[in-house]
């Protein structure tokens, strides 16, 4: 028998979010893969920055570098800034039970900004050498301020904070 879980009693998953600036001052974004399990109404707004969980015993900066490589192939980056606060978002009701094995109410993220100093050929979102499953099906460079308008609504307030934190660093 299934029991309903009050998601407000669940913890936040600790993770990192990564903003990567190119030489022109634009930021890297990827579009989440659309799968048959997507039931969320905002599938047209699946653009986001790389992000991911922090493994047990892992420092947030190390997690940011690992996640960035796993999701984009990028290693040629220099740290610009780490946000001191953690930013949280809750998953919407329609996603409860469909994400992160129903163990978390949302995510609590430490954000980092990096400068990409490599060549575009380094960016690979579906590398066969990478044992991790691809998370993005497209990517592009855009102006930082545009992103809150093209992300899912439940992450928008976090992305607005990220824009505020990083808007004047390049």
From Swiss-Prot:
This protein's superkingdom?
Answer: Bacteria
Q: What are the BP-aspect GO terms?
A: nucleoside phosphate metabolic process; ribose phosphate metabolic process
Span of the annotated motif Nudix box:
52-73
Q: Name one GO molecular function term.
A: guanosine-3',5'-bis(diphosphate) 3'-diphosphatase activity
Q: Which CDD domains does this UniProt record tie to the protein?
A: NUDIX_Ap4A_hydrolase_plant_like
**EC number in record:** 3.6.1.-
Cofactor binding notes: Binds 2 divalent metal ions. Zinc, magnesium or manganese.
Q: Give disulfide pairs as residue numbers.
A: none
Q: Give the keywords, sorted.
A: Hydrolase, Magnesium, Manganese, Virulence, Zinc
* Assembly description: Monomer.
Entry-linked HAMAP family: Nudix_RppH (MF_00298)
Say what the protein does.
Accelerates the degradation of transcripts by removing pyrophosphate from the 5'-end of triphosphorylated RNA, leading to a more labile monophosphorylated state that can stimulate subsequent ribonuclease cleavage. Catalyzes the hydrolysis of diadenosine tetra-, penta-, or hexa-phosphate with the departure of ATP as leaving group. Preferred substrate is Ap4A. Also acts on diguanosine tetra- and penta-phosphate at a lesser extent. Required with IalB for erythrocytes invasion.
Identification of the protein by name = RNA pyrophosphohydrolase
Gene coding for it: rppH
């Amino acid at each position: 028998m299934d029991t309903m879980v009050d998601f407000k009693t669940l913890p936040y998953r600790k993770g990192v979010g990564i903003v990567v600036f190119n030489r022109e001052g634009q930021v890297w974004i990827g579009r989440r893969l659309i799968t048959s399990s997507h039931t969320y109404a905002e599938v047209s707004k699946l653009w986001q920055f790389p992000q991911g969980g922090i493994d047990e015993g892992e420092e947030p900066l190390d997690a940011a570098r690992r996640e960035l490589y796993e999701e984009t192939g990028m290693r040629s980056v220099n740290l610009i800034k780490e946000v001191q606060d953690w930013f949280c978002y809750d998953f919407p009701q329609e996603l409860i039970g469909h994400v992160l094995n129903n163990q978390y109410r949302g995510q609590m993220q430490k954000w980092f900004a990096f400068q990409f100093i490599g060549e575009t050929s380094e960016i690979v979102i579906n590398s066969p050498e990478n044992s991790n499953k691809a998370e993005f099906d497209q990517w592009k460079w855009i102006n930082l301020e545009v992103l809150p308008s093209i992300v899912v609504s439940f992450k928008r307030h976090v992305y607005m904070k990220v824009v505020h934190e990083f808007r004047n660093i390049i």
